[in-house]
From Swiss-Prot:
E.C. number(s) listed in UniProt: 2.7.7.38
UniProt key word NADP: no
Pathway(s) this gene product operates in, as recorded in its UniProt entry: Nucleotide-sugar biosynthesis; CMP-3-deoxy-D-manno-octulosonate biosynthesis; CMP-3-deoxy-D-manno-octulosonate from 3-deoxy-D-manno-octulosonate and CTP: step 1/1; Bacterial outer membrane biogenesis; lipopolysaccharide biosynthesis
Protein name as it appears in the record: 3-deoxy-manno-octulosonate cytidylyltransferase
SUPFAM superfamilies, per database record: Nucleotide-diphospho-sugar transferases
Primary localisation category: cytoplasm
Length: 250
């Protein structure tokens, strides 16, 4: 079942505190604050209403000054998922929205079609949550614990059903490994259930929030896309993002 734009709310959680890159959402990329560039790309995806969810007035002001929507949330949320759930209640108290797409605010080069791809598993199957992955092509990523791997079983062309997420090199044996992309589309009821659950044992062990859903028996389907968008976590990443945007003429 295809979703209409009124069925979908795209939320971009953002906060100023960042240990490796303070003030990251407001860092200039291509002449815009990073959070504005992400919002611009989310709007270009054309899948539904877009808003930035933040606890920082400075971020909200920058987003609104650029013509996009922002909603203020509490400062004490333990995760972006909790922040977007609060924002959902503020923006859609009547429950009209069926799907919430969580786009990280540090992906200034993400392609709009990549955001759109996250909806497809929910449109075509019974999954509670959908997310994205790409085949690992760089040898070093196979053993890098900062690269989260999706362990999944194929359920169609460019589609996996997630069985596990791990920082380890898995699965073993011949075949591709998959680099998880932390963009999620939740059915509304799934997001509500997810944030109501306590952190799970494997979630705490791997430090991967999505394992809470799997341990609770929720189904996560994964769309395979061509490439992993650049996440900006360090000054070096920021310079690379600026170079990529400049080379693409923004």
């Amino acid at each position: 079942m295809a979703f209409s734009a009124s069925d979908v709310l795209v939320l971009i959680p953002a906060r100023l505190a960042a240990s490796r890159l303070p003030g990251k959402p407001l860092a200039d990329v291509g002449g815009r604050p990073m959070i504005v560039e992400v919002a611009r790309r989310a709007v270009a995806a054309g899948i539904g209403r877009v808003a930035v969810a933040t606890d920082a007035v400075e971020i909200a002001d920058a987003v609104r000054a650029a013509g996009f929507e922002a909603v203020m949330t509490r400062a004490d949320h333990p995760s972006g998922s909790d922040r977007i759930f609060e924002a959902l209640g503020v923006l859609d108290p009547d429950g009209a929205v069926q799907v919430v797409v969580n786009v990280q605010g540090d992906l200034p080069t993400i392609a709009p079609e990549t955001i759109r791809a996250a909806l497809v598993p929910l449109e075509e199957g019974p999954a509670d949550i959908a997310t994205l992955t790409a085949v690992i092509t760089e040898e070093g990523e196979r053993t890098d614990p900062n690269v989260v791997k999706v362990v999944g079983t194929p359920i169609g062309e460019n589609r996996l059903r997630a069985l596990y997420f791990t920082r380890a090199t898995a699965p073993t044996g011949e075949g591709p490994l998959y680099h998880h992309i932390g963009l999620y589309a939740y059915r509304r009821a799934a997001l509500e259930r997810f944030v109501s659950l306590p952190p799970s044992p494997l979630e705490k062990r791997e430090r991967l929030e999505q394992l809470r859903a799997l341990e609770a028996g929720m189904r996560i389907d994964v769309a395979v896309v061509d490439a992993v968008p650049l996440g900006v976590d360090t000054p070096e990443h920021l310079e690379r993002a600026r170079a990529l945007l400049a080379s693409n003429d923004n």
